[in-house]
């Protein structure tokens, strides 16, 4: 995926959270946090949508962080309907700032796929409420936010939403409802299902376009 990939951990609210760091070839110009789908349905940091987004971020000079949520791999704890997972990701943001202080003021990207989109959206809202550093780009792919929403949300107007036309897990109408509620544009990939089989190149191109100009943002 990149010149260098390493494994590490940080302390979440229920114990150890493991994550993978994908480094760009040069010194990173920023970083990305990419969140995986439902832990109880096979979702891991190695999901192909997660790795596709992370790879695209790395190719744009970002250091990409791919955590395993509670109960996945070596991460401690049990599935918590996005509540505990969001709290863990707040701890992750703090961990990144402490571990890589040179990136504390750099642009960063927050992306989530399926269940990960629910954590990403609520993490953004939690950070905003606490006046913490907000991501420069927010991406919600296969948006399942309302299935796991536990708090009010206010999404930035430049949020990137991507959905498959024939999503069999989260119907397109569900993504449209979320987009309508928050007055966001929604990018639909024709003939794509939830896992974007055969459409990863197009997905990567859409993410790449959204990342354009990030370093100067």
Each PLM stretch: what is its role?
Residues 165-170, 194:
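Acidic catalytic loop of the alpha/beta-hydrolase fold
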Residues 77, 192-204:
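Catalytic histidine-centered segment of alpha/beta-hydrolase-like enzymes
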Residues 171-179:
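Short alpha-helix in the alpha/beta-hydrolase fold that links the catalytic acid
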Residues 37-38, 139-148:
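Active-site nucleophile loop of the alpha/beta-hydrolase fold
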Residues 155, 160-163, 167:
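Short beta-strand/loop motif that positions the catalytic acidic residue
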Residues 112-120:
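Gly/Ala-rich beta-loop-alpha elbow adjacent to hydrolase catalytic centers
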Residues 10, 16-103:
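Serine-hydrolase catalytic machinery in alpha/beta-hydrolase-like enzymes
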């Amino acid at each position: 995926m990149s010149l260098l990939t390493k494994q590490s951990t940080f302390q979440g609210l229920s114990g150890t959270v493991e994550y993978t760091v994908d480094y760009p070839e040069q010194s990173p110009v920023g970083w990305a946090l990419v969140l995986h789908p439902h832990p109880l349905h096979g979702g891991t940091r190695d999901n192909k949508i997660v790795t596709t987004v992370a790879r695209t971020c790395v190719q744009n000079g970002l250091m990409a962080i791919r955590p395993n949520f509670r109960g996945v791999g070596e991460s401690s704890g049990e599935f918590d309907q996005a509540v505990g997972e969001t709290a863990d990701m707040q701890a992750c943001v703090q961990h990144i700032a402490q571990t890589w202080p040179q990136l504390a003021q750099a642009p960063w990207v927050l992306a989530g796929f399926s269940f990960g989109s629910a954590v990403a959206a609520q993490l953004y809202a939690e950070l905003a409420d606490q006046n913490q550093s907000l991501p420069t780009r927010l991406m919600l792919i296969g948006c399942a936010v309302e299935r796991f929403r536990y708090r009010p949300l206010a999404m930035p107007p430049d949020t990137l939403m991507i959905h498959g036309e024939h999503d069999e897990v989260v119907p397109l109408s569900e993504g449209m409802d979320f987009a309508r509620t928050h007055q966001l544009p929604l990018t639909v990939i024709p003939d794509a299902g939830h896992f974007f089989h055969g459409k990863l190149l197009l997905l990567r191109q859409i993410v790449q376009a959204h990342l354009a100009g990030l370093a100067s943002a």
